[in-house]
């Protein structure tokens, strides 16, 4: 047992945030770099005539929601911006108090819902998200919101899809 030599990782896992530990700053930066890349990709894709445009936008919305989900559970009150913010100088003026906690969860959930609607049932590449991946993340958001029935409905859909199973004991 124990935390070994990775105490900052252990502290992050138990939500003991200490701003003097550089791992938290690196995590924050990496997640927001991911958000920004997704936003840039969405802006570019929206202006393209790429034949897989809608699927790729759904993938980017899934990834953006994934990054924001992690930001929300680690840091709680976070700045939120989407693809409509394209000027990097605007980032400094985005407040982490612009949205309530419930509003942030809804924004994250809306991206997962859009991903669920836009993603195919399966993907040719293993690492790409599919419809049930988005639905499973929706269940996680409902769980963090305390919306038990919605969580149960979402998880039942994933389980009953027949595509996934628990590993044997």
Locations of regions flagged by a protein language model:
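Short, surface-exposed recognition loops and adjoining beta-strand edges that mediate ligand/DNA contacts
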Residues: 1, 81-84, 120-137, 144-169
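Conserved, well-structured interaction surfaces
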Residues: 2-75, 95-106, 112-126
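Short, surface-exposed, charge-dense and proline/glycine-enriched linear segments
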Residues: 7-20, 80-86, 111, 148-160
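Extended, well-ordered alpha-helical segments in internal regulatory regions
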Residues: 67-76, 138-147
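Short coil/linker segments at helix-helix boundaries
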Residues: 77-101
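Mature extracytoplasmic enzyme cores
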Residues: 110-111, 134
